Amino acid sequence: LPLKEYVMPNCTFHIVDAFTAVPFTGNPCAVVTDADGIDPSDMLRIARETNAPETAFVLASDKADVRVRYFMPRGEIPFAGHPTIATGHLLRELGVLKPGTARFEFAIGVLPVDIRPDRVIMTQPPAVPDTCADAGTTAQALGLQASDLREGLPCQLMRGGVSFLMVPVRELAALRRINMDRPALKAVLAPLGVSAAYVFAPEGVAPETDVHARLIDPDNAGEDPFTGSAAGCMASY
């Protein structure tokens, strides 16, 4: 194929591991700190090149302290949790944001982000309960039995800035047994208009935790190591 001249602005990006204190663990995010002037089509190209679960692009805002756009390799998304934590942490480390409450402009609106010396806390829009999925079909698509699900709690869509299907299971062992049937899970999720199921148990791996969860996504890598926006939907559920 003939080569054609292609020029785009230079940019700086950092790889930030969110939800961890140990490098190369947690959930990685690429953060481009000087994204003003980058065309959205180039943002998508950069996201595909970094191949991180999400790539954040920091821009100037006339409504907030910063504006942020998030891209997965497949396209732009309106909001996400771990990129917000990663971006807030990096901007604090670079001295762009000082400790206190910062205002981030997202595609879904302006939200507060609490910048602290030792952590970053995001606020997301409340999620509201919506359509329920058939419990037996959902369990089967995840490689589980209907008896693995928590009795009396529905497999339910929680609709918010980003929406997910909530799937409550009885115990941690059920989470470990998940063996997704991709086509079957896609068939469960497609009518709900979401791409992932958030499966959670009422016990944690560590003694100081109360819940353990897995984000099962048949369209991408299969599983996201930590999904902040889904955790917020679970809290609303």
What do the PLM-derived regions correspond to, one by one?
Residues 3-79, 85-237:
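Active-site proximal loop and beta-alpha junction motif in alpha/beta enzyme cores
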